[in-house]
Amino acid sequence: MDSANGCGILKKERRSEEHHYKVHRRVLRWMKSAEKIKRELDEGYEKKWRNRSIEEIKEQKKVHDIVEVMKLLRDKEECDRFFVRTGKYMKGGSERWKMVANGILEEGGEKKVRKVEVGLFKGERGGSVVYHLMFRPTETERTGRVGGSSFGKYDDVDEIKKEESSDMSGFRYPPGVRCEMTSNGNEFRIEYRNPKNTSEVLRTLTILRIPEI
């Protein structure tokens, strides 16, 4: 187990080139309790998130609280095997782009095929900042197929507070065992566990490698 970041991970001997990202506060907030998230959203600048019920926040937390995906994004070689990059576009005065991967979410005996979406923008000093990270259900979920993402077209984040970003290199997870991560080259798997009973798996995210043509 890697006690420094609260997750167990299969360590690799090789050294890979790393992507350097900062992570926006709107991504990191989903690691907090539903009650704290609700307070922040009610007082925040994004109107669409205000006055949500605790039940809604808990459901949204399930698909947004996946910051561990950053470990895969930072490894350039691994990232290129799993994520597809799209074209850049301008919105809210910032240059934005996205990365999309195929994923499977398992929780409570239910398995769903989803897209793992990453939204990025260019920071004031030219660095890349992750401001959006979530699972998004697909229209073809029942068939087990993953279609293309429309996130860029329907990006509803008009304004991004650029100063609210954290350098991921200094980020630490909360105390206790939050999850276990493993990778076999074709799948990157994150098992989220109950900190009070680490034998209990609460949910599992599996990100699938891009099929070779």
From Swiss-Prot:
Source organism per UniProt: Encephalitozoon cuniculi (strain GB-M1) (Microsporidian parasite)
Pfam families in the record: DUF1609 (PF07753)
Tree of life domain: Eukaryota
InterPro entries, per database record: UPF0329
Protein name: UPF0329 protein ECU04_0110
UniProt record similarity statement: Belongs to the UPF0329 family.
